[in-house]
Structure formats: structure tokens, C-alpha cells
Regions:
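Non-catalytic cap/lid and distal C-terminal segments of serine-dependent acyl enzymes
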Residues: 1-155
């Protein structure tokens, strides 16, 4: 719904092209990844900052999915980046930055699960673990220009 309706509204209000990029931070990064995977070809470039990539496999994600979608673990897969990739969704390439001092890194973000899924699926993942950075907006602002350059090169 977001990918279709929001893009339609933007296209009506502004001069746009079909080349689009999507990015986000934390849960917004999760949203960017799942939207891109669910709508192949809609986005020319995809990146994320510290996304939760496998909510069905981590405590906070399981709690949130249970709250929003109920107890059916199978329904959760449509909202889980790693599960979508395991189920056949594909991107050509992907940029993800994550801070190695992020307090959510080991229990919630689990980038190694994304690495394994992308490797198995042949997705070109650039995963950069940024030394000393946490989950803050300072982290995002530090690497935002890199992401903009990444997207610009693909649009």
C-alpha cells in the first residue's frame, strides 16, 4: 500500500522519474528493505542504517509481530527481510551501515542473518560495520552522504 499509494501521490505532486531510491533507519530501514523486496523493480537503489532484518527471530521483533499480526508465525514472514529473501525475493544489491557499538546489534539487529541470506541468494550486499558508532542520529548524519552517493550512482 505504501509503495503504491505514496509513490502515486508524490508522482502527482512533483516532477519525478521512474528511477527511485529507498532508505531508512532502524525500523525505517526494516521498512525500506521489506518494501524493496516486496516490490521488485520499483526501486533502483536500496540502503538502510541499522535495520532490524529478522524480526521473526529476535525478542523485540517477535513481540511486535505478535502484537500486530497475532500468533501465526507464518504471517510474520511477509514482514521479515531475511524470510523474504529465503522465500525467493531478490534485490540486485544493497547497502547497509551499522555501528559496532549499537546496543541493539547482537540481540535485535543481527546483521549476520542478512549476510547469510544475501550470500545464499546471490544478492550483492555491502555491509559496513562502523567502528564506535551506535544507533543514534549522529551515526546516520555521519554516513548519509555515502548513502546519497550510493543512490545517485544507481539512479
Amino acid at each position: 500500500m505504501i509503495a503504491r499509494e505514496l509513490i502515486g501521490l508524490i508522482d502527482e505532486a512533483f516532477p519525478t522519474t521512474k528511477a527511485r531510491a529507498i532508505s531508512g533507519h532502524s525500523m525505517g530501514g526494516h521498512g525500506a528493505l521489506t518494501l524493496a523486496l516486496k516490490h521488485p523493480g520499483r526501486f533502483s537503489s536500496v540502503s538502510a542504517f541499522a535495520p532490524i532484518v529478522a524480526p521473526g527471530q529476535v525478542p523485540w521483533g517477535r513481540k511486535a509481530l505478535r502484537h500486530y499480526l497475532g500468533e501465526d508465525d507464518a504471517a510474520w514472514r511477509a514482514h521479515d527481510t531475511v524470510a523474504l529473501i529465503e522465500d525467493g525475493a531478490r534485490l540486485d544489491e544493497l547497502l547497509v551501515d551499522i555501528g559496532d557499538a549499537d546496543p541493539f546489534l547482537e540481540k535485535e539487529l543481527r546483521p549476520e542473518l542478512l549476510e547469510a541470506a544475501c550470500e545464499a541468494a546471490g544478492i550483492d550486499l555491502t555491509l559496513r560495520r562502523q567502528p564506535g558508532y551506535d544507533h543514534s542520529y549522529y551515526f546516520i548524519s555521519t554516513f548519509m552522504a555515502d548513502h546519497l552517493r550510493w543512490h545517485a550512482a544507481r539512479l
